[in-house]
């Protein structure tokens, strides 16, 4: 079974702890798949912490993916993470992903 299949399997079974190692894989596609999978579990603080750390990564594609994953989060914690990072972010694509995530979160809290 390949890494992408493992990510899909662990995500389907809710085995979040098994997803974390894939976030730092040498294969970017594996990293992106793991980040996307973590987005399904944003109600867990360890997931929020991991996604928050990825927003500091040097890779803009990974930062965009983390912002997109955070869009499924509920509550003010995700908003504060995104707002804080948005103030520091220099890449326009990542900024847009963060704004989209914020809009998505806010639309559910009306």
Cite the ranges covered by each PLM segment.
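N-terminal intrinsically disordered, low-complexity tails enriched in polar/charged
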Residues: 1-13
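Conserved hydrophobic register position within alpha-solenoid helical repeats
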Residues: 3-6, 34, 66, 98
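Alpha-helix N-cap/helix-start positions at coil->helix boundaries
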Residues: 13, 28-29, 45, 60-61, ...
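Charged low-complexity stretches with an acidic bias
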Residues: 58-84, 90-93
């Amino acid at each position: 079974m390949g890494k992408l299949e493992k990510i899909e399997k662990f995500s389907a079974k809710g085995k979040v702890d098994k997803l974390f190692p894939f976030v730092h894989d040498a294969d970017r596609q594996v990293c992106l798949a793991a980040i996307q999978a973590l987005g399904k579990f944003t109600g867990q603080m360890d997931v929020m912490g991991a996604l928050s750390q990825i927003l500091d990564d040097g890779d803009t594609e990974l930062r965009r993916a983390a912002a997109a994953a955070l869009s499924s989060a509920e509550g003010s914690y995700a908003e504060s993470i995104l707002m804080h990072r948005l103030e520091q972010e220099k890449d326009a694509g990542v900024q847009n992903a963060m704004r989209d995530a914020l809009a998505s979160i806010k639309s559910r809290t009306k």
